[in-house]
Amino acid sequence: MANNKISLKARLILYHKGKILLLRQTKPNGGNYTLVGGNVESYEYARQSLIRESHEEAGILLKEKDLKLVHVLHKKDKNAHRIVLYFKAYRWEGDLKARETHKFNEAEWFDLDRLPRNLTDTIRHVLVEYRKGNFYSEM
């Protein structure tokens, strides 16, 4: 029987005035734009993780009731599976800025029709699938 490794992540599609929030990674981390979010720790549920990550990475405060699951991505490689849950929100509080400066150097709002070229491949894939109305995709 195979010994599959599975990881669970949660990411945020945060809207404000018709645009979505993206964080730009520092050069050592790729220099690309990505969504807020990360690993769901063993003591957390996905929305709790996203609330924590959003505050750590972008200085924003979210409430569980404002997070709606809109997409599930299943990624796999030779040795592992990764499930990523994407939540949408329109409400938030706080002082928005890239806070984990060793990982991110900017927080910016982008129109879904004018996304930056240097968006991570995974995030680009998910946003295309999400806009098509697809709740689930594989990569």
Residue ranges of model-derived segments:
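Conserved beta-strand segments that form the floor/walls of ligand-binding pockets within enzyme
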Residues: 34, 68, 86
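Active-site-adjacent beta-strand/loop module that shapes the phosphate/pyrophosphate-binding cleft
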Residues: 8, 16, 73-96, 108, ...
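A short coil-to-beta-strand element that immediately follows conserved catalytic motifs
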Residues: 61-71
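Conserved N-terminal beta-strand and adjoining loop/helix that marks the start
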Residues: 1-21, 70-72
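NUDIX/MutT-family hydrolases
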Residues: 98-131
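A short beta-turn/loop motif at secondary-structure boundaries
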Residues: 27, 75-79, 101-102
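Acidic/histidine-enriched, glycine/proline-rich intrinsically disordered or flexible terminal extensions
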Residues: 132-139
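Conserved Nudix-box catalytic region and its N-terminal flanking loop in Nudix hydrolases
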Residues: 16-56
